[in-house]
Amino acid sequence: MERIVEVEKFSEESSFETTLRPSDWDEYIGQEKIKNNLKVFIQACKKRGETLDHVLFFGPPGLGKTTLSLIIASQMEANIKITAAPMIEKSGDLAAILTNLEEGDILFIDEIHRLSPAIEEILYPAMEDFRLDIIIGSGPAAQTIKIDLPKFTLIGATTRAGMLSSPLRDRFGMHFRLQFYTPQELAQIITNAANKLSKDIDAEAALEIAKRSRGTPRIALRLLKRVRDFSDVADEKTITLKRTQKALEALGVDERGFDELDLKLLKLLADAKGKPLGLSTIAAALSEDEGTIEDVIEPFLLANGYLERTARGRMATLKTYEILKLTPNIQNSLF
């Protein structure tokens, strides 16, 4: 069953997100430092008539990596080709993509940490020298054919920057870590989205949704979509705070943005009485895979101080005990 606060994209959300996606810097709310730096770099490249350096975006899912890439392409007046690492299985897959690029094009590779070492090897000269090296044959008779490529910009996006190999990471001229959004930023995103949907929303209602969106625009827009359903069924022209609170309660999202799975995880850590729990232990107890816990559930909890991740495992924090209304174990070294 899909969680309403899931940060990964639902299969039916692509068209909805596309409708609400900002198309320029003025529309894009948040990530101000990244925006301001990119504006300068893009302006400088256009002034010199150069292609933009390769860009790496990393951070938790749902924070706008794809949207930023689309805006970069728009600002550079460039075509953008979008793919994902799992779709590039063979060297021929990457070669086909690279040889179809034109001068100044942007290639966006999502989940770039999932590229195989063999594919990375092909990407190195393409990124550095705009050259594709194709090996024909094997053994002593093998020959390397070098094909010149047009100058292009590679934008890589990943939720797991630590899994990128050093040679690949070093070939990106710009590295940007996306941060969680503030409730105020999310409230503005929600208000703008509601306007695009021709639906009025009270400022208090937008902020209420924002506070429960785990700092993530994708979740904020999903919650807005569901709250709008409740409002429309009630024949209300405006989404009110009262309707929003009732809708979010019905959806099982509390005032912190936690759902049942979050609370189960925190309760599990609190019940450990100060003993660190390993990722595999937590995954087994929650019937979730380790990757989902590490990449999807934990980032928000870590960023907001609801759990501590140490070399020995995960531990509850004082905030965890407070929200669960439990007394912390006095032997817990955190206290």
Swiss-Prot record:
Binding-site positions, DNA: R309, R314
Amino acids binding Mg(2+): T66
Major location (coarse): cytoplasm
First-level EC class: hydrolase
GO (cellular component) term, any one: Holliday junction resolvase complex
Region entry Head domain (RuvB-H), spans: 255-335
Compartment annotation: Cytoplasm
Residues annotated to bind ATP: L20, R21, G62, K65, T66, T67, E128, D129, F130, R171, Y181, R218
Coiled-coil annotated residue ranges, if any: none
Pfam families, per database record: AAA_lid_4, RuvB_C, RuvB_N
Catalysed transformations (reactions): ATP + H2O = ADP + phosphate + H(+)
GO BP of this protein: DNA recombination; DNA repair
Record keywords, A-Z: ATP-binding, Cytoplasm, DNA damage, DNA recombination, DNA repair, DNA-binding, Hydrolase, Nucleotide-binding
SUPFAM superfamilies noted in UniProt: P-loop containing nucleoside triphosphate hydrolases (SSF52540), Winged helix' DNA-binding domain (SSF46785)
Region of interest called Large ATPase domain (RuvB-L), as start-end residue ranges on this chain: 1-181
Role summary: The RuvA-RuvB-RuvC complex processes Holliday junction (HJ) DNA during genetic recombination and DNA repair, while the RuvA-RuvB complex plays an important role in the rescue of blocked DNA replication forks via replication fork reversal (RFR). RuvA specifically binds to HJ cruciform DNA, conferring on it an open structure. The RuvB hexamer acts as an ATP-dependent pump, pulling dsDNA into and through the RuvAB complex. RuvB forms 2 homohexamers on either side of HJ DNA bound by 1 or 2 RuvA tetramers; 4 subunits per hexamer contact DNA at a time.
Subunit-level organization: Homohexamer. Forms an RuvA(8)-RuvB(12)-Holliday junction (HJ) complex. HJ DNA is sandwiched between 2 RuvA tetramers; dsDNA enters through RuvA and exits via RuvB. An RuvB hexamer assembles on each DNA strand where it exits the tetramer. Each RuvB hexamer is contacted by two RuvA subunits (via domain III) on 2 adjacent RuvB subunits; this complex drives branch migration. In the full resolvosome a probable DNA-RuvA(4)-RuvB(12)-RuvC(2) complex forms which resolves the HJ.
Domain remarks in the Swiss-Prot or TrEMBL record: Has 3 domains, the large (RuvB-L) and small ATPase (RuvB-S) domains and the C-terminal head (RuvB-H) domain. The head domain binds DNA, while the ATPase domains jointly bind ATP, ADP or are empty depending on the state of the subunit in the translocation cycle. During a single DNA translocation step the structure of each domain remains the same, but their relative positions change.
Homology family: Belongs to the RuvB family.
Name of this protein: Holliday junction branch migration complex subunit RuvB
Source organism (scientific name): Nitratiruptor sp. (strain SB155-2)
Lineage of origin: Bacteria, Pseudomonadati, Campylobacterota, Epsilonproteobacteria, Nautiliales
Gene: ruvB
